Amino acid sequence: MSYRMNRRTYAETFGPTVGDRVRLADTELFIQVEKDYTTYGDEVKFGGGKVIRDGMGQSPISREGGAVDLVITNALILDWWGVVKADIGIKDGKIHKIGKAGNPYIQDRVDIIIGPSTEIIAGEGHIITAGGIDSHIHFICPQQIEIAIASGITTMIGGGTGPATGTNATTCTPGQWNIWMMLQAADAFPMNLGFLGKGNSAKPEGLIEQIKAGAMGLKLHEDWGTTPAAIDTCLSVADEYDVQVAIHTDTLNEAGFVENTIAAFKDRVIHTYHTEGAGGGHAPDIIKVCALKNVLPSSTNPTRPFTVNTLEEHLDMLMVCHHLDKNIPEDVAFAESRIRKETIAAEDILHDLGAFSAIASDSQAMGRVGEVIIRTWQTAHKMKVQRGILASEKKEVADNFRAKRYIAKYTINPAIMHGIADYVGSIEAGKLADICLWKPAMFGVKPEIVIKGGAIAWAQMGDPNASIPTPQPVYMRPMFGSFGGATSSTSLTFVSQEALDAEIPKKINLKTPAVAVSNTRNISKADMKLNEATPKIEVNPETYEVRADGELLTCEPAYVLPMTQRYFLF
C-alpha cells in the first residue's frame, strides 16, 4: 500500500527533491533541485524505528564484499556540474559513488551498499559541497589552517616559512631547506598542502632545484623583481617540469608595462593573482590580462565584493603587508596607485560574467583566510541584486547557473589551475572525500561538518560535558580526524613529479601521502569551468574606467551585505 506525503513533509523528512528550492543563507540566491538519485518510498534514513537497520536498509554484506565505510544520506549536492539530491558513498577516504544507498537484497537500484561496517551521516536538511581550495596562501602562521578548515577550506596552496619579512609580503617558500621544512610541517595538519618556490630569477638553475626539492609550482612576485627576464625564465622552467606559475606583477611599471609582461608570457599559461590590481600588479591596467586565453585570473577576497569600506581599509593593509613607510612620499604614492574604485567595481561584474575564474584569500597579506567562501557568495548575492538574473538563467526559476559559476571559483577551477583536479575540487567518484555539510541557513558562513579524506575533521560541537552533543556553547571544534596519524592519512601533500620520482617524500620522512601535480601547462582559460569568458578589456589610464567589449563596467558599492553581523554575534 502506497503512502502519500506532501512536499513540505517530504522535504522535512528526507530533504528537498526535484523542483524544490533552497535559499542560500540570508542571500537573495536560491538553488533548485535538478535531479534526485534516491527512490521515493525506498529512501534510507538512520535513527530509532527508521530505515537503516539490519535486514532493512542495512544489508549483511561485509566491507570486503562491497559495503562502503560511510554514507551521507539524502544529500543536496551543490557543485559546478549540478544541483542534485543523492546518497554519497565513501570508501578508503575517497568518494566511492554518488547514487542510491541501501540494501540490494530488498531495495531496487542500490549502487551504494550499506552494511555492518558502514557509518552514517544524515545529509537530509543539509547542502553538501566539495571542500574549498585556497590557492593564494601566505604561510605566515600555522593557526591559519585552523581558521581555514573551520570555514570549509580543505586545500591550501601558496608559499612561506612563517612570519618572515619575505613571507609577510610574498607567497614563496624559497630553496630546498625551506621547502623540506614546510613539507615536514605539513604532516601535522588535516589539510591538503602544496608549496610554491620563489620564481624570480633570470637564470633557471635556482628554480629547477626548488622544483626538484618538492615545490608544486613557482611564484613570481614584484617584491623580488618580476621583470620580463624573470617571467620568461620561470615559465620556461615550468614548461619543462609541468608545474604552474603564479604571478604578482610590477605595480610601479619599473621593468615594463602590462604589455611587456604579456609579451614575456609568450602565450604560455599562467595564474595571475589579484588580477584586479589592488593586491598588486601593473597600475592601473593589470585587469586587462583577464581577456587572454593563456591567463587564469583569480581575485583575492579583500576586494570581494565592492563595498563602502573597501577603499579605506586597503591603504592601511597595503602599507603593512609590503613593508612601506607612511612617512616616505614614494611609499604612499605606491600604495595609492593600487587602490582604484573603478577597477574594483569592474571586478565584481567580471566575476559575474565568468571572466575572473577563481577567488582566494591572500592570507594575512591583504586577505582573510577564513572568508574565501563568505566573500564569494556575497559577491554572487550583490551581483544578483544589482544585475538581476543571468542570461542563461532566464528559463530557470532559481539561481542554479550563478551558484554553479561561483562555487567553481573556489573548488574545481583552482584545482585545474594547479594540476590537482584528479584528487580534489569537486564531488565526484574517485576523488578525495573532502566534503562540507551546511545547514541552508548557515550556508557559506559556518559549516556543520567538515569531512577530510573520509573522516570528520572539524564540526559544530556543543559542551563536551553535556549529556547530548547540542548544548551551548556550540562552535567549530577539531574532531578525531584532526589528531594523531589521522591528520596525515586523510590528507595529501602536492609536489612536483620530479620530486616524487626522486623519492623526496621518503627521503625526508613524510607521513602524509605525496602526489604529483600534472597537466598544468597544456590548459587554458577555456578549461575554467563556467568561468572561461575572454572579453576584450580596455582601461582608461586617466579615469581608470573599465570596458568589456566596449561596455562600461561599473556598479555601486554595497552598503549592506548578507552573511555578516547576524551570524557573528558571538
Curated annotation (Swiss-Prot):
It comes from Trichodesmium erythraeum (strain IMS101). It is found in: Cytoplasm. Its cofactor is Ni cation. Residues 131-570 form the Urease domain. This is Urease subunit alpha. The keyword Cytoplasm applies. GO terms for cellular component: cytoplasm. Ni(2+) 1 binds at H136, H138, K219, D362. Substrate binds at H221. One of its GO terms (biological process) is urea catabolic process. Binds 2 nickel ions per subunit. The modification N6-carboxylysine is found at K219. It catalyses: urea + 2 H2O + H(+) = hydrogencarbonate + 2 NH4(+). It is an enzyme of class 3 (hydrolase). Signal peptide: none annotated. Carboxylation allows a single lysine to coordinate two nickel ions.
